[in-house]
């Protein structure tokens, strides 16, 4: 019986969601930053952890600079 990577409890077939090559409980598959519940294949991954595509993954790991949502977007020089 596979174990959920988030809570380490056994994942039964009826409650299983497969994502990132692992079996999760549906409520355990959440964005690491904001906690939003994610759907299988409808999210991004960084170092084996799930993130919602927008805004969390884009803000944390996307391109930085003017107009990209990074720290420099709102800096006037």
Curated annotation (Swiss-Prot):
Gene3D superfamilies: Cysteine Rich Protein (2.10.110.10)
Disulfide-bonded cysteines: none
Alphabetical list of SMART domains matching this protein: LIM
CDD domains (alphabetical): LIM_CRIP
GO biological process, one term: cellular response to antibiotic
UniProt cross-references to Pfam families, sorted A to Z: LIM
Protein name per its UniProtKB record: Cysteine-rich protein 1
Organism: Bos taurus
Taxonomic placement: Eukaryota, Metazoa, Chordata, Craniata, Vertebrata
